[in-house]
Each structure stands twice: as C-alpha cells, then as structure tokens.
C-alpha cells in the first residue's frame, strides 16, 4: 500500500482497515507513507515506512514528482530485497498516484490505482480554458492504460468520461468495514449519550458543503444540537462559525473537532447527515448504519445512492438547502428501521478476499484487458 500520508480522512482509515484485515488473514503488508503526518494508530505487525523528502532547494516543486518517485523506488527495492517481491501494489489518492506512475521499480501489471473520490468534482469544477485542458492531460498521463480500482462504479465512470481515459483493467471494490471493531469502539464513553442530537462527520472541506448543512439545519425546524466532528483550515472553520452566528444557530452547533474514534458519537446520535457535493463512496454512511443510526445524504455523485437503497432511499435529498432540510425533518420524525440491514457486501472479510483475488488476476490479466469487472 502506498499513500500520501495518514491525516484524519476516510481514505486513510480505509487503507489501515484493509491492511489490518489482510494481515489477520496471514498476508505480509507494507505501507509506504509519503508524509510523516499520521492521525491514526498503526496496526501491530504492519511494515510501516515513511519516505521523507528532505529537499530544500528553491526549485524543489519543479522536480518534486520525479524526485519523490526515485525515493519510493529505493524504498521498494530495499523492501523487496529483504522480504521478496510484492504480489500486489495499491496506490491511494491522486498525488500518490502521480508519484507511483513514475516509479520504475513497480510492475504495471501488479500495480492498481485506487480512486477514492469523484475526480471531475475535485479537480475540474473550478477550472476553465488552458488550466482545464492541462489538468485533463496530466490526469490522462497518470491513468491511461493502467489498472484502476474504484470504490464505486461512479468514480471509474467519471474518470473515463470526464478525462477520456481507457484503463488497462478496471475493477470496483467497496471500502472495507470491520463490523465488530466499529461496534466495540462505539460503546466507548460519549459526553452526549442520552441526549437527542444529529451529527456530521467529515473534514472541513468545500466538497463536504458544511455551509449547505448549516443552512438546511437552520431551515429544518430541528432544535436538537448539531455536532460537527472534523477539522479543517482556520479560514474555513472561522467562516463556518461566522455562518452559525449569521443563521442564529451558534448556540446549537457543536464544533467537536477531529477524533480518531467518532463511533460513540455516531451511535448515540439520532441521525447522521451527509451534505456533500460528491462522495467517492460515503464511508460514514455505512459506519452509521453499522451503529444502527439513521442517515440522510444529498443525492450527490458517487457512492451514497448505491448505499441508500430500499426504504433507506427516503434519506436521499436533492443538492439544495430546502430539500436537505425537508429530508432531515422527515427522517428525524419517521426514521427507517436500520437494525436488520444486510451490510455484508461491505464486510472486511469479503473486501479483503476481493483484493486477494486481484493477485490471481495479475497472473492472468489477458481476460480482463479493457474489460470492466465488478467485485
């Protein structure tokens, strides 16, 4: 596994859950981190290596990708000399992918680029003209004719259509969840246990649309507190706090900050809300359902519509303040039964096996070439 650091985000948590699950099934796992940042505990037994870029030259940004690729090359070669060749390599997050694409020590047939988000929303939405053309060209250079793994079908389709990319092979594998671990952590103490409140869990980033959430909450008529678990830049945090004052809800909005264990807060909440413009998968939706907490989400590009099906689809709102407010009020007053759901498609056991299956497919890739496979 290769990733650009381990800050407190969903993709980072997925990587550690996957690594732990694979090790528990007898596999040797190495995790190469391209930054020192780490907000999560590292699983026991994981070969964890931080590859530091110590360059301080004025032109370091111009040579960053090739320089860091060379450092990664050296680390890969050293690890394989010590423990044998890797059977499978998975690169996570776009900046990591740009570096991994330049690594000559990695076999293209064994290397998969894992897409965690909707690229057009993240990288094209604010661009036009030459900037738009250049970003598309750079992205095509990374993924064209390479193995692509998507956490939802939407993220793969978006990459292919928005950037005109044809992967060598493509596969959909959902994010893994350790149900027992999530439930065990959810029974840790929670300061608001026994109170009615709704919750949002996610970093303070423009795509998460906390502004939409706050306006919808103000319009919903709900008086129970809204707890925000997450962190972001000082600028965004200041703007959000100012918006709560403008909407006259500052006394009901709790800025909890980041916590490595949000599950007690999720379990005791009466409802969890996602207000994003896009979600590659929607980890927190599954985590809430594991904790038997009803959920509301915008009907945004990505994974939420594939997670919230059947009666859960009542929790899907259009991507505007009024629809989100009305849906929040409806689910608050008439929650669906979330105690008897089949969440096995997201189990760590099932997902780990699908990753292991990629090793066999690497040995016989011809039958997958330019074909779409959903696992």
For each feature predicted by the language model, list its residue ranges:
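Aromatic "clamp/platform" in nucleotide-sugar-dependent glycosyltransferases that forms part
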Residues: 258, 277
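A short, active-site helix/loop in glycosyltransferases that binds the activated sugar's phosphate group
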Residues: 144-170, 179
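Conserved acidic donor-binding segment of nucleotide-sugar-dependent glycosyltransferases
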Residues: 50, 310-322, 329-335
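A conserved mid-protein helix/loop that constitutes part of the nucleotide-sugar donor-binding site
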Residues: 12-17, 196, 200-219, 238-239
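Membrane-proximal helix-turn-helix segments that form the acceptor-binding/catalytic region
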Residues: 129-148
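Short His-centered aromatic/hydrophobic patch
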Residues: 91-97, 115
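N-terminal strand-loop element at the rim of the active site
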Residues: 2-8, 13-15, 21-64, 169, ...
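Short hydrophobic beta-strand element within catalytic cores of glycosyltransferases
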Residues: 294-298
């Amino acid at each position: 596994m290769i990733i650009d650091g381990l800050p407190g985000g969903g993709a980072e948590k997925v990587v550690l859950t996957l690594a732990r699950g694979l090790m528990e099934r007898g596999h040797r796992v190495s995790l190469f981190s391209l930054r020192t940042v780490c907000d999560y505990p590292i699983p026991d037994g994981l070969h964890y290596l931080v590859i530091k870029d110590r360059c301080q030259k004025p032109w370091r940004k111009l040579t960053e990708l090739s320089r860091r690729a060379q450092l990664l090359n050296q680390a890969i070669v050293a690890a394989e000399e010590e423990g044998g060749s890797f059977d499978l390599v998975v690169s996570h997050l776009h900046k990591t992918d740009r570096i991994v694409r330049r690594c000559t020590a990695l076999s293209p047939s064994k290397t998969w680029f894992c897409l965690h988000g909707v690229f057009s929303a993240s990288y094209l939405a604010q661009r036009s003209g030459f900037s738009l053309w250049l970003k598309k060209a750079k992205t095509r250079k990374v993924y064209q004719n390479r193995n692509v793994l998507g956490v939802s079908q939407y993220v793969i389709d978006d990459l292919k259509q928005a950037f005109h990319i044809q992967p060598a092979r493509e596969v959909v594998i959902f994010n893994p969840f350790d149900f027992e671990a999530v439930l065990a952590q959810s029974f840790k103490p929670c300061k608001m246990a026994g109170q009615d409140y709704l919750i949002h869990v996610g970093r303070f980033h423009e795509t998460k649309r906390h502004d939409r959430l706050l306006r919808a909450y103000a319009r919903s008529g709900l008086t129970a507190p809204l707890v925000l678990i997450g962190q972001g830049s000082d600028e965004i945090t200041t703007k959000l706090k100012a918006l709560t004052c403008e909407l006259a809800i500052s006394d009901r909005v709790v800025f909890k900050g980041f916590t490595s264990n949000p599950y007690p807060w999720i379990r005791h909440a009466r409802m969890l809300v996602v207000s994003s413009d896009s979600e590659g998968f929607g980890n927190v939706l599954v985590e809430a359902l594991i904790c038997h907490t009803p959920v509301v989400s915008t009907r945004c590009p990505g994974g939420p519509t594939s997670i919230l099906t059947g009666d859960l689809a009542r929790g899907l709102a259009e991507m505007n303040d009024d629809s989100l407010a009305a849906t929040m009020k409806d689910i608050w007053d008439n929650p669906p039964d979330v105690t008897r759901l089949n969440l096995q498609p997201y189990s760590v056991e099932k997902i780990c096996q699908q990753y292991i299956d990629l090793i066999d497919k690497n040995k016989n890739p011809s039958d997958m070439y330019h074909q779409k496979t959903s696992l």
